[in-house]
Curated annotation (Swiss-Prot):
Insecticidal toxin that reduces the survival of aphids (A.pisum). In addition, it increases the sensitivity of the aphids to two commonly used chemical insecticides (imidacloprid and methomyl). Does not display any antibacterial or antifungal activity. This is U1-myrmicitoxin-Mr1a. Negative results: does not show antimicrobial activity. GO terms for biological process: venom-mediated perturbation of biological process.
């Protein structure tokens, strides 16, 4: 999973 993508959800 792309960690940068997860930060976008935050």
């Amino acid at each position: 999973i792309d960690p940068k993508l997860l930060e976008s959800l935050a």
